[in-house]
Each structure stands twice: as structure tokens, then as C-alpha cells.
């Protein structure tokens, strides 16, 4: 069992990559809630790191945070984004974090395909948890949650 990256490390990893790829500023805004409810969110996307133990990377955003993320990744105005762009952006964010986490603590794991949570499920049986709330873009008020959870007995 490896120690999960801290919320601050998750934010730093996302910031380094997003600055290089999209010119998008990401800052740490605190820890996000434990668990991954899909309710009251515009979109919640997960990417598994398949192996033992099983890790799940999760990104979620409300309308404002999702639009800011999509705007940065697609180089357009926030009002020109749509639900598909938001989901694509969250999938990309999950893949970015999954690749970084794999290199940090799960080199033998395989990165699974991103998928969207379409109901109000909460991930249960979490052994370890680390989650960061990120401020996205230059406005300072758009937020996206990114988290990693470790599960025992899977993989």
C-alpha cells in the first residue's frame, strides 16, 4: 500500500500539467468532501487505476466550474461551452491526474477508460482518501473537485 498524494500535491500536479497544455491556472482551494456523490453536480467522471489495490480518480464540477474548465481546454468563452465539452474536459482532467498518480504510486497499474457517473452513487469501502478542491482559470470563483480513493480487496 502506497501513501496517496496529498490534496496539495494533487493540485500541484494538475496545475503543472494544465499550465503547460492549456495555459490554465489551477490553484488549491482546500480539501474536498470525502466520497464522490454525483448529486447536484453538472458532471462526475471517474477513471480507474486497475491493479491491487484499486484506485479511482474522480473529477466533478458544478455548472460554473465545468464551464470554466471547458472554456480553458477548448479555448473559448464560458458561455460558448456545452455539457459535452464539460464532460470531455472532466475526462481529460481525470486522465491527466491518473497518469501522474500512476507514475507516483502505481507504476504497475493500468489506466482504465473514463466514464461518467450517471446517478447519485457514492463510492463506499474506501481505505484511503485524498481530495482537492481546485480553483480553475482566472476568475477565482470557478471550482472543480479532483480526488483519488484507494479500495482494498479489488484489483
Where are the predicted features?
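N-terminal auxiliary interaction/assembly segments of multi-subunit proteins
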Residues: 1-155
Amino acid at each position: 500500500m502506497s501513501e496517496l498524494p496529498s490534496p496539495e500535491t494533487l493540485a500541484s500536479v494538475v496545475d503543472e500539467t494544465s499550465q503547460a497544455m492549456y495555459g490554465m491556472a489551477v490553484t488549491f482551494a482546500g480539501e474536498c468532501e470525502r466520497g464522490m456523490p454525483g448529486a447536484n453536480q453538472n458532471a462526475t467522471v471517474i477513471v480507474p487505476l486497475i491493479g491491487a489495490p484499486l484506485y479511482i480518480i474522480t473529477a466533478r464540477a458544478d455548472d460554473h466550474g465545468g464551464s470554466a474548465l471547458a472554456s480553458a481546454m477548448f479555448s473559448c468563452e464560458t458561455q460558448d461551452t456545452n455539457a459535452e465539452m464539460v464532460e470531455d474536459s472532466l475526462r481529460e482532467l481525470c486522465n491527466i491526474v491518473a497518469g501522474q498518480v500512476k507514475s507516483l504510486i502505481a507504476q504497475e497499474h493500468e489506466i482504465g477508460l473514463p466514464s461518467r457517473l450517471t446517478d447519485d452513487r457514492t463510492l463506499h469501502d474506501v481505505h484511503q482518501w485524498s481530495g482537492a478542491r481546485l480553483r480553475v482559470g482566472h476568475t477565482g470563483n470557478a471550482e472543480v473537485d479532483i480526488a483519488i480513493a484507494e479500495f482494498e480487496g479489488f484489483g
